[in-house]
């Protein structure tokens, strides 16, 4: 048996999980050894909070706290800054990296993983391994982002 949580709007998912008392139940079962698989919104809720989602806040959840299965935040579907495209669509908006840096400015002890498409973080015991064919980016307050190769043990970078 395992727990599988897919995508959708993270705010809505978190609101419903809190509403039905499932956040605590899922967290407890997963922390007791039941495998957890999450992608998109499902990866966001594995984090301590939903604060690094890309979703619109279409509802107000009871709390931004999520499952806290991992000690860092994930930004799924991470897109690298592309200055030419960003210039064309820049309407006072921000890149993903800008948003992550804003988050880190007020959450200075947290790390954020920019997880690109078709990538996953496989947790085995206390080790975190990047799976898939693309690099991931680790953001930490006051430091340059670090890119890590697929199939690497990324534990020391995210803990």
Predicted regions and their residues:
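C-terminal and late-domain segments of enzyme folds
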Residues: 2, 50-52, 56-159
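Short, active-site-adjacent cap segments at secondary-structure transitions
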Residues: 10-11, 43-46, 120-122
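Charged helix-capping and loop-helix junction motifs
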Residues: 17-24, 58
């Amino acid at each position: 048996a395992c727990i599988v949580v897919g995508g959708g709007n993270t705010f809505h998912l978190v609101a419903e999980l809190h509403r039905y008392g499932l956040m605590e139940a899922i967290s407890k079962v997963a922390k007791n050894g039941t495998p957890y698989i999450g992608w998109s919104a499902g990866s966001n809720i594995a984090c301590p909070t939903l604060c690094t989602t890309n979703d619109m806040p279409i509802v107000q959840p009871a709390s931004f706290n999520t499952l806290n299965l991992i000690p860092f935040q994930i930004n799924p579907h991470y897109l690298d800054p592309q200055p030419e495209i960003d210039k064309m669509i820049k309407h006072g908006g921000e890149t993903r990296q800008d948003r992550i840096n804003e988050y880190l400015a007020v959450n200075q002890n947290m790390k954020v993983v920019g997880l690109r498409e078709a990538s996953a973080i496989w947790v085995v015991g206390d080790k975190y391994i990047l799976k898939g064919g693309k690099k991931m980016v680790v953001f930490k307050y006051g430091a340059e982002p670090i890119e890590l190769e697929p199939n690497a043990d990324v534990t020391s970078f995210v803990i």
